[in-house]
């Protein structure tokens, strides 16, 4: 039986109190599930949500929505990997389309975060996906391949097992277009083949 990974990115939603309530409800719903579950609340709710999950004896993983590319220093507004570790975070989402499109994060910049997270023992959920322009131009595979190659540069066979690839059909977000299961499966297949090519 295939094991699924259910990841919840809460984005800029929930106060700590709301996060505790939501996490508790999720923990009750997935108790005893064979599937892997992760929740990524806002930074301000990580501590409270993590404590709530631990108090319930839940095996839900605590994730962060982002992290700094630097370990320490004068980086106003950033959150370091060490800070995340201290809160019990085991997973970090990197390369999300909103980080790429709104904040201008490049493959090279994301790669720096990926390598740092893996070095510190965190699991990485790496988001990839083609834009509407790339899809309309017939460059779906090239767009996704460029992201995979750029974001995974320098990641070795010994750590690639700690990377989960998440496909985001960016072209279907806010465009009125819909990504069908067939659309997603075609890209999933390509991603599996590309990772196999890169890592054998």
What do the PLM-derived regions correspond to, one by one?
Residues 1-200:
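Active-site loop-to-helix "anion-binding N-cap" substructures in soluble metabolic enzymes
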């Amino acid at each position: 039986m295939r094991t699924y990974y259910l990841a919840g990115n809460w984005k800029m939603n929930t106060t700590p109190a709301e996060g505790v309530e939501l996490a508790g409800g999720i923990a009750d719903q997935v108790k005893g599930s064979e599937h892997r579950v992760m929740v990524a609340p806002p930074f301000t709710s990580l501590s409270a949500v993590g404590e709530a999950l631990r108090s319930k004896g839940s095996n839900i993983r605590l994730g962060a929505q982002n992290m700094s590319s630097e370990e320490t220093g004068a980086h106003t507004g950033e959150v370091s990997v060490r800070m995340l570790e201290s809160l019990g975070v085991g997973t970090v989402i990197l390369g999300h389309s909103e980080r790429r499109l709104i904040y201008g994060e490049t493959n090279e910049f994301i790669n720096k975060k990926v390598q740092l997270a893996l070095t510190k023992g965190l699991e990485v959920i790496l988001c990839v996906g083609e834009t509407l322009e790339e899809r309309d131009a017939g460059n779906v595979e090239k767009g996704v391949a460029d992201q995979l190659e750029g974001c995974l540069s320098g990641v070795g066979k010994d750590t690639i097992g700690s990377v989960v690839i998440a496909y985001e059909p960016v072209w279907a977000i806010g465009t009125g277009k819909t990504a069908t299961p067939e659309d997603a499966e075609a890209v999933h297949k390509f991603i599996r083949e590309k990772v196999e090519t890169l890592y054998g």
